[in-house]
UniProtKB/Swiss-Prot annotation:
Top-rank lineage group of the source organism: Viruses
Protein name per UniProt: Replication protein E1
Enzyme class: isomerase
Span of the annotated motif Nuclear export signal: 106-115
Subunit structure: Can form hexamers. Interacts with E2 protein; this interaction increases E1 DNA binding specificity. Interacts with host DNA polymerase subunit POLA2. Interacts with host single stranded DNA-binding protein RPA1. Interacts with host TOP1; this interaction stimulates the enzymatic activity of TOP1.
Protein's organism: Pygmy chimpanzee papillomavirus type 1C (PCPV-1C)
SF3 helicase domain sequence ranges: 451-601
Residue stretches of biased makeup (Basic and acidic residues): 163-185
EC number: 5.6.2.4
Motif placement: Nuclear localization signal: 83-85
């Protein structure tokens, strides 16, 4: 039994501390043990067998492995107990993630029986960078409702229930909390890497741009859906540009553009330099070409740029570029684009208020536009420099204006044509052709077909002047002899019209003859000749005839000179004997010649017909009189009202 000498009744009779000395049974001079010899010097011989270096058997290896495994489990359990001791709550983990905290720190059984478990918060990963994390366990995540911790104590009270818990958790996860000031200390390279790791880089760049410049990028640009659509003006926003590149960008872009408006924003939240530039290239480019060009000049990836065409119809966007161009924050080279000047100069703004139909009609008349589609398309393209065209585009009655313009232009053209004689008309058509051709190919082609030129010239003279009984010329012959090519080239030069018997079921098929100087009926068949023999004898005579017009009253007209092509020779058939005296017939028996390259040997073009009529004007009785040798003294047509000057 152990010795009971000691302090068993400590603290029962008094309050406080007192010293107790240990009792030693051995006295000086006594031998400690019988088996110990103090006279023997310590030579270390007793430590010879301290290390067991005997060969290890197979059973010993298994026992040693088991011992190592048990020791490792014990060490791991001790570390886990230490971690649990210093955790303020199962929902607060050094990892900073609720999911990992619950999975790693709480046992599965305890997690299964928990009754009041807090819902998991929705998280949104922003920038994944290992440089931000301290321990390297994972990437930082920012919660939608961020839990802010100060001095190791969460604001929502999840730090534990006891004082000991709070004291033990004072120094825990504050090293994982990164404030905004700490994140802003990262380099520009880190910011660029963060952009690359974003799920939607384009949306991030739009947000960065609005933070930098205080307005949305879409306020200045319109959107092109396709990357292949070309445009001359482009707005580009670039992020993460190095300062050395920014200094030389102005000179690098000059050979490619005629106008540049450059704005630099330096060191915005360590994002590097941010570029906003409006460029007008020398040639139109698409978005892909602009991206490759500027990525090379700025030395940044293509997905770090926003590239869209500017809003040329927005006065707000034009005012922004104008105001920034006169400030010291921009570098501007070249002439200001017309769409900016048009919307920022007072005179242009006053002129854009109202649309004048007379100016549109005058433009269509001067440029020979009578088709509604041509008028609408061509006049809309003038909106960049014509204030009246811009007002036309801003109007809600564009279709009505186009229809009215085409109608008025046709009326003016028809009245002008009816007022001219055939001599004046040929001169008018010749003045529209700038080239000087050769009349000989036409004569050579007629000789190739076996037609006597003098006879053809005399009958052509009667046909041009609309002589009765000589008002119709028919050219007949086998296929591929050049009948249609010859007549079509002549009608094109004279500005005539073409009628088709295919519409004979409608009695309006002759209506184009009302507004024509000459006409052509191509490829007349047996039924067509029968119709002409039955209903059109008076028309072939060149006498006045009543023509029915659609949605209009009957018109009394004199048939214009008429050309007819056909494969049928009416002079060989008895039933067309009443047309013999009304139709002048020429035969084309020979095929139309072509060279080895497939080109026509005899060129029948407008320039050659112009030279033909100018050369043979005397023979055709269309030469200018002596009074007209000095030029046309008539005033040009003008439908725009002039300014009346009133004297005082």
């Amino acid at each position: 039994m152990a010795d009971d000498t000691g302090t068993d009744n400590e603290g029962t009779g008094c309050s406080g501390w007192f010293l107790v000395e240990a009792i030693v049974d051995k006295t000086t001079g006594e031998q400690v043990s019988d088996d110990e010899d103090e006279t023997v010097e310590d030579s270390g011989l007793d430590m010879v067998d301290f290390i067991d270096d005997r060969p290890i058997t197979h059973n010993s290896l298994e026992a040693q492995a088991l011992l190592n495994e048990q020791e490792a489990d014990a060490h791991y359990a001790a570390v886990q107990d230490l971690k649990r001791k210093y955790l303020g709550s199962p929902y607060v983990s050094p990892l900073g993630h609720i999911e990992q905290s619950v999975d790693c720190d709480i046992s599965p059984r305890l997690d299964a029986i928990q009754l009041s478990r807090k819902p998991k918060k929705v998280k949104r990963r922003l920038f994944q960078s290992r440089e931000i994390t301290d321990s390297g366990y994972g990437y930082s995540e920012v919660e939608t409702a961020t839990q802010v911790e100060r001095y190791g104590e969460p604001e929502n009270g999840c730090g534990g229930g006891g004082d000991g818990r709070e004291k033990e958790g004072e120094g825990q996860v504050h090293t994982e909390v990164h404030t905004e000031s700490e994140i802003e200390q990262h380099t520009g390279t880190t910011r660029v890497l963060e952009l690359l790791k974003c799920k939607d880089v384009r949306a991030t760049l739009h947000g960065k741009f609005k933070e930098c410049y205080g307005l949305s990028f879409k306020d200045l640009t319109r959107e092109f859906k396709s990357d292949k659509t070309t445009c001359g003006d482009w707005v580009v926003a670039g992020f993460g540009v190095h300062h050395s590149v920014s200094e030389a960008f102005q000179k690098l872009i000059q050979p490619l553009s005629t106008y540049s408006h450059i704005q630099w924003l330096t060191n915005y939240k360590c994002m590097g330099m941010v570029l906003l530039v409006l460029l007008r290239f020398k040639v139109n480019k698409n978005r892909c070409t602009v991206a490759r060009t500027l990525a090379t000049l700025l030395n940044i990836p293509e997905d770090h740029m926003l590239i869209e065409p500017p809003k040329i119809q927005s006065s707000v966007a034009a005012l922004y570029w104008f105001r920034t161009s006169i400030s010291n924050a921009s570098i501007v080279t070249g002439d200001t684009p017309e769409w900016i000047a048009r919307q920022t100069i007072v005179e242009h703004g006053l002129a854009d208020n109202q649309f004048k139909l007379t100016e549109m009609v005058q433009w269509a008349y001067d440029n020979d536009y009578c088709d509604e589609s041509d008028i609408a398309f061509e006049y809309a393209q003038r909106a960049d420099f014509d204030s009246n065209a811009k007002a036309f585009l801003n109007s809600n009655c564009q279709a009505k204006y186009v229809k009215d313009c085409a109608t008025m232009c046709k009326h003016y053209k028809n009245a002008e044509m009816k007022k001219m004689s055939i001599k004046q008309w040929i001169k008018y058509r010749s003045n529209k052709i700038d080239e000087t051709g050769n009349w000989k190919p036409i004569v050579q082609f007629l000789r190739h077909q076996g037609i006597e030129f003098i006879s053809f010239l005399s009958k052509l003279k009667l046909w041009l002047h609309g002589t009765p009984k000589k008002n119709c010329i028919a050219i007949v012959g086998p296929p591929d002899t050049g009948k249609s090519a010859f007549c079509m080239s002549l009608i094109k030069f004279l500005g005539g019209t073409v009628i088709s018997y295919v519409n004979s079921s409608s009695h309006f098929w002759l209506q184009p003859l009302c507004n024509a100087k000459v006409a052509l009926l191509d490829d007349a068949t047996q039924s067509c000749w029968g119709y002409m023999d039955t209903y059109m004898r008076n028309l072939l005579d060149g006498n006045p005839m009543s023509i029915d017009r659609k949605h209009k009253s009957l018109a009394l007209i004199k048939c214009p000179p008429l050309l007819v092509t056909s494969n049928i020779d009416i002079t060989t058939e008895e039933r067309y004997k009443y047309l013999y005296s009304r139709v002048t017939l020429f035969k084309f028996p020979n095929p139309f010649p072509f060279d080895s390259n497939g080109n026509a040997v005899y060129e029948l073009c407008d320039a050659n017909w112009k030279c033909f009529f100018a050369r043979l004007s005397a023979s055709l009785d269309i030469q200018d009189s002596e009074d007209e040798d000095d030029g046309d003294t008539s005033q040009a047509f003008r439908c725009v009202p002039g300014t009346v000057v009133r004297t005082v």
